[in-house]
Regions:
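Primarily a LysM-type cell-wall glycan-binding module
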Residues: 445-483, 488-500
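Generic beta-strand/beta-sheet core signal
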Residues: 362-366, 484, 501
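Membrane-lipid interaction segments
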Residues: 2-446, 450-453
Length: 501
């Protein structure tokens, strides 16, 4: 008598692991000659743009750029802005095979000091957070034949990353300030946001379409023809489409793509009526493939004593696309020192998914205002909000989310209250895990037979009892019990008398 066993490989995921590193940020901003002197610093912020995680030789590298923005008041009472861009990078030791890796970068405490009228020193840190899932290859039983072997066969759908692809390109466009606007002077603040609106997978190619949104808050040049002082807010939307080479990718695969927009480079045209905009964009595409895994979760022999070894395995079984646009309406009460509003905007932070699957939105609500004498002021407050997501109620093992502002507008009421309406986009993927037991080894003792079976057994099964347990107890197949008793479900829906013949 022979026992024929067939095994298959399956990549199991370990417990999600998180690694952290503090990266110092130290820089000095020396004001260019055409910038006015510093009298008072109003606002300073560090913003980051991260690159995709790079895996190489047992290390996972988190990198990107951090931009330190400083808004200040000049000796003439003007609202001015300057910034310093610097790269960052940190490599984490991650031995073993990594199933998935994603990073986030959080801004820590930043200190700012005007050393003199022309120099601003900044000292602080950012925190790089790496989230990984280790992959472990296991051999599990897929089928067994001979020697009276009876298998409880199950099937699970698994999702694995078929490939990650990166393509960098640069968008260079001209933005018109519009009719009646005075000549451009200088930038107070600017921002960029990239959104992929369409993503298609074809054989060995990924096709993306979307748009890049640029916002610029600016003031006119001092001797402009228009007497308006500003500031003015100009918004530009540039459509983009790019194709990414992706060898080995199938049309049936699922793709999650995003445009990572760096900090824009903006300069005025000679006549000050247009802006020359240059921005670096990174397309990051992650492709997922679904597979069906058949395995044996339990077995026994109708003829011989058998020994079965089972292990608990965890797999990524679902990749849930997350694309949620949340309309946020907030009121900003003006402090007594403020009389008029210059600008109100929202700066979203890294979104999270809580244990219950809900999305957690954190943001800073920011406002430039003026006091009764026309001097610039700055205020901000934090926003925290939970919203529904497609991943609610799921066992989330891992997620990759990004955020940006789709649309935004503000108004200033007579009662001394600023109101802001923002459409916040949360985009990315949440990965769900499934844990189950599978047979990893089995053997039979051909010297020990199970003995003769009774001709017939009447068994009274309780509600909720599993037919497999009954079949294993009496060493008959589950299929024969279902056929003999005209049953269609493995779990008894009520107390039932079962004939085992």
């Amino acid at each position: 008598m022979e026992l024929d066993l067939n095994f298959r490989k399956v990549f199991c995921c370990g417990i999600p692991e998180e690694k952290k590193a503090v990266i110092p940020v130290d820089c000095s901003i020396i004001l260019p000659d055409y910038f006015p002197d510093v009298m008072k610093i109003l606002r300073y912020k560090a913003k980051t743009v991260k690159n995709p995680v790079v895996s190489e030789g047992g290390t996972e590298t988190v990198s990107g750029n951090v931009n330190i923005e400083v808004s200040y008041i000049s000796e003439e009472g003007e609202l001015c802005s300057c910034s310093q861009l610097q790269p960052f990078s940190h490599s984490f030791d991650c031995p073993g095979k990594i199933s998935a890796a994603e990073s986030e970068v959080f801004v820590g405490e930043i200190g700012c000091k005007a050393v003199n009228k022309r120099r601003i020193d900044l000292h602080g840190s950012i925190e790089a957070v790496l989230r990984i899932i280790q992959a472990e290859e296991k051999q599990i039983l897929s089928s067994a034949f001979g020697a009276g072997a009876v298998c409880k066969k199950e099937s699970i759908e698994t999702v694995f990353i078929a490939g990650e692809f990166l393509k960098n390109f640069t968008v260079e466009e001209k933005g018109e300030l519009g009719y009646g606007k005075p000549p451009f002077g200088k930038i107070i603040r600017s921002s960029a946001f990239g959104e992929v609106t369409e993503c298609h997978v074809i054989q060995d190619k990924i096709v993306t379409k979307g748009e890049i949104k640029i916002k610029v808050l600016w003031v006119p040049e001092e001797n402009g023809e228009n007497s308006e002082k500003g500031p003015f807010l100009s918004e530009f939307v540039f459509p983009v489409s790019r194709m990414v080479d992706a060898d080995g990718i199938l049309q049936s695969d699922i793709c999650d793509a995003r445009y990572d927009a760096d900090f824009p480079e903006i300069s005025p045209s000679e006549d000050g009526q247009n802006l020359n905009i240059r921005i670096k964009i990174g397309i990051f595409a992650r492709v997922y493939r679904k597979t069906k895994t058949d395995f044996v979760s339990d077995m026994f022999s109708t003829d011989f004593e058998s020994k079965v070894e089972r292990e608990k395995i965890s797999v990524i079984n679902e990749a849930i696309p997350v694309s949620v646009t949340e309309k946020i309406f907030e009121k900003f009460e003006l402090p007594e020192t403020a009389e008029d509003v210059i600008d109100v905007w929202m700066e979203p932070k890294v979104p999270e998914i809580g244990k219950d699957g809900k999305i957690i939105i954190r943001a800073d609500l920011c406002m430039f205002a003026k006091d009764p004498d026309g001097n610039p002021l700055y205020f901000e407050k934090e926003l925290l909000k939970e919203i529904a997501s497609p991943a609610e109620g799921k066992q989330i093992a891992f997620y990759n989310l990004c955020t940006g502002i789709r649309e935004e507008e503000f108004s200033f009421g007579k009662e001394g209250r600023a109101e802001i309406s923002s459409s916040v986009l949360i985009d990315g993927t949440a990965f769900c895990s499934l844990s189950t037991e599978a047979v990893t080894a089995c053997s039979m003792d051909f010297e020990k037979k199970t003995g003769e079976k009774p001709a017939m057994v009447l068994f009274f099964g309780e509600k909720g009892e599993n037919l497999w347990d009954i079949a294993k107890k009496y060493r008959v197949s589950e299929e024969s019990i279902m056929k003999e008793n005209n049953l269609s479900e493995e779990i008894l829906s009520e107390k039932t008398m079962i004939v085992i013949a």
